[in-house]
Amino acid sequence: PLWGLPGNEKAKTGLSNDMTVGNIAELAQDDSIAFRLRCEGEAPPRSAMYYRGPVLSRLDGQKWTGSGFPRAPSNQQQAERAPAGSAADTVRYEVLLQPHQMQWLLTLDVAVTPPALPAGWRSLQMASMEWTSHRPITDVLRYRASSQLNYHADASIPAPYLRPYLALPPGLNPRTRELAQRFLN
């Protein structure tokens, strides 16, 4: 999600580590360019251009934050064997990412292989399938990536890796908790 970055008097829309309930309405819109993307060959339709950045998967009742869990090696191997889209669904592209002071590498959803970064840069895929760099993006960064637009994750991902995405905040309305449990079963 593209949310508020702490700034001068008012936050601007941008990448953030968290989002608090009710604060999104207070964000000032920022028309500056966040990144540019150039596809090899034909670009996918706009409706397929969902960009994966930070995934805010934990809610404490008031604030969403990211889980920060890197993928386990066995989970990575499962993802590589998972049924993905056809070769026709693979999009290869180049990203020119503007500095955002965070570590996220924006990719079309879902980049199942590491983005090709310049020398001296390393990437890590998180459990939520977002890609991060080993250091904050403080200058313009150019990299190549490839994504499968119709990717489907392996349904046999171990429960410990799913738990953060299924957790409910404390103090939740009992009827809401009951409904959530029905969804999980």
Q: PLM ranges: what are they?
A:
Residues 1-185:
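Helix-boundary/low-complexity linker signature
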